[in-house]
Amino acid sequence: EDTIRVGAIADLSGIFSSLVTQIVDAQTVYWDMVNANGGIGGKQVELVVLDNGYDVPTHLERYEAMRDTGADGVVMISQSTGSPHTAAIAEMAIEDDLAVIPLSWFSGWSDPAFGKNIFESYSNYCYESMNGVEYLNRYMQDQGIANPTLSIVGFPGEYGGDGSAGARLAAEALGIEVVADLGGTVIPGADNTPVISQLVAANADMVWTTLSSGTLTEAMLGASAQGYEPMWSGNVPSFSYLMLGGDLGPLLDTNYIVNTYIVTWNTPGVPGLETLKAEMAAAMPDAVVSDSYIVGWTEAQAAHEALEQAAKNRDMTRAGVVRAFNEITVDYDGLAPRQTWGGGDPNASVVRETYTYDVVLADYDAGATLAEGGGTGTVLVEGPRAADITKAHTYAGACYQG
């Protein structure tokens, strides 16, 4: 075998496809860079990408192809898009000795009883919500609102449930009154007008969202049309920098706080970002500037480090790659907080830090290419940091128990 087959089961045609396509592009460029520099242990890496259309049964079909122990199989999966999708393969991944990096930040992945072979990237929806609500509360107090009220709104399932659970934990710890808890009520593609009406009626000072960029756009524009413009914030998938080019841009500028697990495109002083930009611009000069590349790049960094460790251990089997993940620390060249998975104590190893960014519409360059360079419209406020309430939380499994 002169190649190392690495799999990605990615949403290339479903609700997150615009972002995931860019994430896969970055992984592709990363592995091309690794291969140009001699590969891993003298072998070239072949990235095998299959589309799940953000559909769980399709994801399971794709996994069946990748778990094959013959020539069609892969040694690890460097991206599995979706929380319910990855949950559906989590137990099989243990049976198959396959390491999987999820494109999902469900807090259950850190629990060895559930996500033993799921090697998560960065923090999770729950802790991101705790950090985010703590910042939002502080921000409102700085604006002169001593006891700001909160509404929570999100999707059902592992993603929505986990993000909303973290917001509830933060509200409880900080004594924030939750005037509307609409976690689990927003259905993508459905008529969400009644939910928006409930948000407007509750009239909270701040709203925490665990949505998609499409449903956040509906909610913010729908509420604004009824004269309701609170301070909005939410989990990573709620926001896309591309929204700044649409009707919502001005309201995002004044009324939305962005949370991230990674740095964004224009964050100064990050050595790994300069490497990424140079490689991406050389490989795809006409592609648009995007924060999503950083997600794909860091996924590939973690996979690369594990494969290098497996090669060093002289065990490039699937089990050898799983073992390698449990031995390494990944520093991501400053693109994200340092990460480890081994050691046997998830409360010690779970990443609690996230980043807070301000939306600056003037810094958004719509359609700017990698060759030209440009901004994605966010400026770092704080991070990587964990709120005191997040540091104090004992990790004992997923915040959301569906």
Give names to the regions the model predicted.
Residues 71-183, 231-256:
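Extracytoplasmic ligand/sensor domains, especially the bilobed periplasmic-binding protein
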Residues 164-166, 213, 218, 265-328:
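Extracellular/periplasmic ligand-binding modules, especially the Venus flytrap/periplasmic-binding
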Residues 1-27, 50-57, 81-84, 154-162, ...:
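Extracytoplasmic "Venus flytrap"
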Residues 4, 330-402:
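Solvent-exposed, acidic/polar segments of extracytosolic/periplasmic ligand-binding ectodomains
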Residues 4-6, 25-47, 69, 141-143, ...:
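Signal peptide-proximal N-terminal region
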Residues 53-75, 138-142, 190-203:
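Short, well-structured alpha-helical segments in soluble
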Residues 223-297:
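Extracellular/periplasmic periplasmic-binding protein-like sensory domains
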Residues 48-57, 123, 180-191:
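Short beta->alpha junction loops
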